[in-house]
Amino acid sequence: MRHTWRWFGPVDRVSVQDAAQAGAHGIVSALHHIPTGDVWPVDEIGKRQEEVRAGGLEWEVVESVPVSECIKTQTGPWREHVANWQETLRRLSAAGIRTVCYNFMPVLDWTRTDLRWTARHGAKAMRFDRIDFAAFDIHLLERPAAHEDYDTATREAAERRFREMTEERRLALSRNIGAGLPGSADGYSLPQLREHLRTYDGVSREKLQRHLVEFLAEVAPVAERTGINICAHPDDPPWALLGLPRILSNAEDYAFMLREVDSPANGVTLCTGSLGALAANDLPAMTRQFASRIHFVHLRNVLREEVRTPCSFYEDEHLEGDTDMVAVIAELLQEEQRRRAAGRVDHQIPMRPDHGQEILDDLSRGAQPGYPAIGRLKGLAELRGIERALSHATYGLSAATR
């Protein structure tokens, strides 16, 4: 696999040189300062490339070109935004970039109730607590239909939890849930979040699925002509939140998307952490099912704290948690072998160690939530070790089949 590292630009406290020292081959980045829906300027794309090259690596994957809420709801200037997305693909292709990640999550990107929860050994990790989330939804956000989305036991537990919360914890919970895209300074206040939720009134799961397919029908041909692989990131977590539909949460969702827009450029961002929060998702089987259309990989592990859906979970160490990471990597390596045999130019799949616990000097250094230097370095080293062992000529996968 092609080992990559997410970098949020010059504001990132972890440098490109740090990434190179950690063993990364390339950088994953985006132009977070460009307003969603606008075309990315050629000079800004070139500037980011030069910033990355100054650290000794190349910008190889875009994560993400945001999809505007106008596109998702098909309201306002959504057609203009689709045209701008197409033009951005052309410009990225002209700059030599071949992989573009995006997501179709309405309003909220990844959602956590704690950004620096204390895990074992004193490490800090991100966590989703379903009772805290219900307390936020019912008692802080005061969403009109919130009570209907939770069973009696959850509502009662949420009410107790809310009463026990300090005002400081209530404010922190609102900030954590209302945080914007990683790398973005944008976030939602409670009034802003209520307003954004109202824009999805009447947008059913089926309607949002149709909007995704219609969006892909416009952009996938451009991606195919320009030699770019576009890859949809799964919902995080993979279940409905705040009454909003989720449409990329399991194998059935991805099979529908790939079947409806059957272009080799239209593919999957395999995020084992996002999909792994849902116990029904068999990650090695999903990797095998969608192998030929996996264009980008996020390797991360979560530990589900309950046998139910939705559940509370936290981001565990990369080789711990509920996902069999060795099996997933084995499937990916076998797919790379098939691609080489078929002569595919994209035979090497870009992968990044997704998130990481804050450990050692991370705890005092500070970083974008989920993106500390040492926690990710440790994760990448462990993942690279699995890959190296499975690829060994004498003791690896190929030897086992002889």
Curated annotation (Swiss-Prot):
Listed pathway(s): Carbohydrate metabolism; pentose and glucuronate interconversion
Superkingdom of this protein's organism: Bacteria
EC number: 4.2.1.8
Paired cysteines (S-S): none
Coiled-coil positions: none
Catalytic reaction list: D-mannonate = 2-dehydro-3-deoxy-D-gluconate + H2O
Keyword set includes Iron-sulfur: no
Function per UniProt: Catalyzes the dehydration of D-mannonate.
PANTHER family in alphabetical order: MANNONATE DEHYDRATASE (PTHR30387:SF2)
Protein name from the UniProt record: Mannonate dehydratase
Native source organism of the sequence: Rhizobium meliloti (strain 1021) (Ensifer meliloti)
